[in-house]
Amino acid sequence: MTEHVQPANPSDATPQHRYTAELAGQIEQRWQDRWSEEGTFNAPNPVGPLAGDVPADKLFVQDMFPYPSGTGLHVGHPLGYIATDVFARYHRMQGHNVLHTLGYDAFGLPAEQYAVQTGTHPRTTTEANIVNMKRQLRRLGLGHDERRTFATTDTDFYHWTQWIFLQIHDAWFDKEAGKARRISELEAEFVSGARSLEDGREWASLSVSEKEAVLDSYRLVYHSDSMVNWCPGLGTVLANEEVTADGRSDRGNFPVFRKHLQQWMMRITAYSDRLVDDLEYLDWPEKVKTMQRNWIGRSHGAQVKFQADGHEIEVFTTRPDTLFGATYVTLAPEHELVDDIVAAEWPRGVDSRWTGGAATPAEAVAAYRKSIAAKSDLERQEYKEKTGVFLGTYAVNPVNGHKLPVFIADYVLTGYGTGAIMAVPGHDHRDYEFATEFGLDIVEVISGGDLTKDAYTGDGTIVNSDFLNGMSVADAKKAITERLEADGTGKGTIQYKLRDWLFARQRYWGEPFPIVYDAEGNAHALPESSLPVELPEVEDYAPVSFDPDDASSEPSPPLAKAVDWVNVELDLGDGLQTYRRDTNVMPQWAGSSWYQLRYIDPTNPDVFCDKENERYWTGPRPEIHGPNDPGGVDLYVGGVEHAVLHLLYSRFWHKVLFDLGYVSSSEPYRRLYNQGYIQAYAYTDARGVYVPADEVEEKDGKFFHQGVEVNREYGKMGKSLKNSVSPDEICEEYGADTLRVYEMSMGPLDTSRPWATKDVVGAQRFLQRAWRVVVDEESGALRVTDDAPAEDTLRALNKAIAGVSEDYTALRDNTAAAKLIEYTNHLTKAYPGGAPRSVVEPLVLMLAPLAPHLAEELWSRLGHEKSLAHGPFPVAEEKWLVEDTVEYPIQVNGKVRSRVTVAADAPREEIEKIALADDKIVALLDGQDPRKVIVVPGKMVNIVR
């Protein structure tokens, strides 16, 4: 037996052995120490430094890891962590080898901005924040394998982030094979003649630099002079996903401008089809799948060629059936052809609405581009007022030869299709609005609408379309595409909204690129032996930011200041030469794109993850999950806000690693679960400034801060809203197990719920009742007996076991808690002098996933030397799950009038007889015979008068 803790200095009014917050704190500290000392939650690997005996039944549970904020956790943060801990603990008790740990997503803008504000190096603040967060998480009793934790800022971790970057850089996407291959294989095909150059040149005739340029054009990581989102206020470029709907930065809320810059890009678009198609095999919320499908935006249509002033405008349309209804062509203002085809002067008689008041088309274009520079893509698509200018040029419709005026307009984007549209105002709302604004023709080509009022976008018969007349829309699409292909003026094709991933940031706090440049500016990937490229320690790590509204500013990365680090002498095969390091850093998504794999093999110095360990933890298991199982982490829990950022990026990286043979799973996460959020009230004064929520008083339905009335709003919990509640505060006042039970009892895990500190005491009272089932509050003695339990208790026990097991498996911890409360109440009422051990111990075991410290303490007091962390979890006996009796509601003419309880195996005739003999029914019938009696076995009795 182990020594049991006692509460220090209990008050006279409180029984000496009551389960108080003070006693809970002592119990929790003691068991946390023991778990850590004994490695209770250490999960063995098949091979390597963490090798051990591994059972076939395994479970890999993962949380979306946190950013180590300087403010620490509030009670909303642990919601998902506690839920996964309950899930992991339950399955560990079922005999599974459970891998559950937690790392820290520590690179990126937030840490750097916080460091700049405080004047402390980001590594110093980040490491201090991690220490504090680890302390907070440990206090919650999370059963993590502490050997597997890391931060993305650890050199041993980002060594492998850089290594994966090099593998992607050294790969290309073979469209015929539908997968990534090594760039050396592509070069071998060029050398052998198995693959020809697109321009017809012979490979052997190319210079070394020309060959490198060809290979670079195929790589999955490439340099591009691309249109990017430039944020002067942050001093960096941003991915599309990091820009808000109103054209501002997600971090800092600064204006974002579109401009051309030379940047590293990742060719995620090569995987568009697989990223869409493989969603079918994932056990993910349909909402997230839909978000990814919409973000990738795959659409079938036709690419049509319009001749314009000696140039060819390629237009992608999903509605080639409406080609005869095109009355103008519109280009995105940034389209590469705009400057080539803009006319020198306005055509005679041009409509003044088309010119923007400019003297020449070129002046109109320049002024228009300037006017829309600060608009986000979403603003440009949704803004009600349609704007644009005429280029003074006409394009020829390939199906009827009509001359169509060519405009630029901000509602056309370069990021989708070809950046050019054929405008069909009769059957597209935005085109209709533009045509109405500019006095352009509107032609009906699909019957069924009233074009004097609005565009018609419904189905119908094709009209005013020559050889298509009388066809359905579907038949017309097929026929026009065949005609375009036959004439050489178009072809059927597929387009995507997804753009390649902008993979560089002009910041300090991120992973350095394993890339150097020679004197001519050519990029060279470093050999693996040069990894890791460590982030240099610099005194001035602040970003070079600019006037937030200065769209003409240019990036100036902080790493460029580290001259001694930037300039380096290396021998890359041509003798010792001076090179210049890349001074950008990777985006904050880099580490999270593969971290699940490092959890598997966190201390391996030779590879990022041993193949045998990866196969064990994340390899496909078709015998369990079906023939199309992609493999991956068994359960991944986190917020839905990462649907098109982290989750899309991680799928892309993982698929490349799969194609190159480094992993056996084709997807990183087999099952995804999105938890809801804990929300809270916040309060603002007359100025709209938030005031501390804990200083607000309620009087007669109104709310006051320091005597002044304030407004109440409901939403997220956070420091800026001044409504945060620290888990430390709740643990101190009630204990960690109480916090765990309260958060899991608040409602279904996938819904948001309001925090109410005053309600936490309810969870504490439940745990106190569970404590009293085992321990006498006055003496501290055990209250259990060796008596045989009553049959109704055995029924209650086995019903609880079956229900709680089902709930834990399905992440329904709120209903599991309700069943445990019900069973605890049964034991309390049925056995005031002490319950039988045989029905108490299963309660303690069932309680363990939710309230592990309390359960361990009670299990120990019941005489067990070993921890219950590895079970066994109780198993229900089927014979006790069959009910002896059934309650039947009795309806009379459709309304429930009474209820009767009968034997579960009672025949229909007896049920009818008992129902008709019920006092309330006898009174209602008043001596009359019912017209009909319907007995639904096990459900109800319906009487028709």
Swiss-Prot record:
It catalyses: tRNA(Leu) + L-leucine + ATP = L-leucyl-tRNA(Leu) + AMP + diphosphate. It is an enzyme of class 6 (ligase). GO terms for molecular function: aminoacyl-tRNA deacylase activity; ATP binding; leucine-tRNA ligase activity. A motif ('KMSKS' region) lies at residues 716-720. Its EC number is 6.1.1.4. It comes from the Bacteria. It is found in: Cytoplasm. ATP binds at residue 719. A motif ('HIGH' region) lies at residues 66-77. Keywords: Aminoacyl-tRNA synthetase, ATP-binding, Cytoplasm, Ligase, Nucleotide-binding, Protein biosynthesis. The keyword Protein biosynthesis applies. Pfam families: Anticodon_1, tRNA-synt_1_2, tRNA-synt_1g. One of its GO terms (cellular component) is cytosol. PANTHER family: LEUCINE--TRNA LIGASE, MITOCHONDRIAL, LEUCYL-TRNA SYNTHETASE. Belongs to the class-I aminoacyl-tRNA synthetase family. This is Leucine--tRNA ligase. It comes from Rhodococcus jostii (strain RHA1).
